[in-house]
UniProtKB/Swiss-Prot annotation:
Active site residues per record: D7, D9
Gene name as annotated: gmhB
Subunit and partners: Monomer.
Matching InterPro entries: HAD-like_sf, HAD-SF_hydro_IIIA, HAD_sf, Heptose_bisP_phosphatase, Histidinol-phos
Cofactor(s) needed: Mg(2+); Zn(2+)
PANTHER family registered for this protein in UniProt: D-GLYCERO-BETA-D-MANNO-HEPTOSE-1,7-BISPHOSPHATE 7-PHOSPHATASE (PTHR42891:SF1)
Protein name: D-glycero-beta-D-manno-heptose-1,7-bisphosphate 7-phosphatase
Organism for this UniProt entry: Pseudomonas putida (strain ATCC 47054 / DSM 6125 / CFBP 8728 / NCIMB 11950 / KT2440)
């Protein structure tokens, strides 16, 4: 199985320091939906692992998050692709859960879902927490310069991190 795991906000869609709280605020980064569809059509399983503490903070209900993910799935399907397993952490940063990145709980849940190990699997993110979660499970950390990626890069990243401009560049590399 060829598995690619993506963070959501800042990788697939535009991010906001004020959170993505409505379906209208969920706007794909140009090329990201096409990249997921192309990867899927080329035999890649594309899963998503996303921190969504806005739920715990009361900024939006679970139904809104599910609508965003349904929109993502529909947009990718329109281009002939498929989004695999989507996992999210609804907890706030002080709740002590095992799923909120940089903890690796969501990545482990994806591995369990697909019954595979994560050694060498690419986990694409735009933050230090994403890269740390990848390293915690032996996955390959991959940074995109979209979202918070440029700021993350300026602060320094683990030396094994692969760096790409965006998700479309990753698709070109892997296909």
């Amino acid at each position: 199985m060829k598995l690619l795991i993506l963070d959501r906000d800042g990788v697939i869609n535009y991010d906001s320091d004020a959170y993505i709280k409505t379906l209208e605020e969920w706007v794909p980064i140009p090329g990201s939906v096409d990249a997921i569809a192309q990867l899927s059509k080329a035999g890649w399983t594309v899963a998503v692992a996303t921190n969504q503490s806005g739920i715990a903070r009361g900024y939006y209900p679970l139904a809104t998050l599910e609508a965003m993910h349904a929109r993502l799935r529909a947009l990718v399907a329109e281009q002939g692709g498929e989004v695999g397993h989507i996992v999210y952490c609804p907890h706030g940063p002080d709740e002590g859960c095992d799923c909120r990145k940089p903890k690796p709980g969501m990545l482990r849940a994806i591995a369990e879902h697909y019954q595979i190990g994560l050694e060498g699997v690419w986990f694409v993110g735009d933050s230090k927490g994403d890269l740390e979660a990848a390293l915690a499970v032996g996955a390959q950390p991959v940074l995109v310069k979209t979202g918070k990626g440029e700021r993350t890069l300026e602060k320094g990243v683990p030396e094994t991190t692969l760096i790409f401009d965006d998700l479309a560049a990753i698709a070109r590399e892997l296909i």
